[in-house]
Regions:
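A common structural junction motif
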Residues: 24, 68-73
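Charge-dense polyanion-binding interfaces
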Residues: 75-91
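A short linear boundary/processing microfeature
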Residues: 66-69, 79
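Conserved catalytic core of Hanks-type protein kinase domains
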Residues: 53-54, 80
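Short S/T/G/P-rich N-terminal loop/turn motif that feeds into the first structured element of a domain
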Residues: 1-47, 55-65, 88-91
Length: 91
């Protein structure tokens, strides 16, 4: 989950989604990949979230460490992020 900096533009936020949306075609370890902006129903929520499903821990590590994924983080996410939260769990 991300909380954007106040200066983040709509174009920058849309670019994050567009760039991350390319990853399922590049990374077969991604079994499901969903993302979107908070609906604004409750105050205090994060602004945006992504959820990814993997078969196993190794799949997650492949995604996490993928150079293309890392480049998206560095180029498009880090410049506009105020706060990040994440969790990995088994179901």
């Amino acid at each position: 989950m991300f909380r954007w900096i106040p200066e983040a533009t709509q174009e920058q936020k849309q670019r994050v989604a567009a760039e991350l949306s390319r990853l399922p075609a590049l990374l077969p370890v991604l079994r499901a990949y969903h993302m979107g902006a908070d609906l604004g129903i409750d105050e205090g929520n994060f602004d945006w979230a992504a959820a990814a499903d993997f078969d196993d821990r190794e799949g997650y590590l492949t995604y996490r460490d993928n150079p293309e994924h890392r480049a998206i983080i560095a180029e498009f996410i880090r410049p506009i992020i105020a706060e990040r939260a994440a969790v990995q769990y088994e179901f």
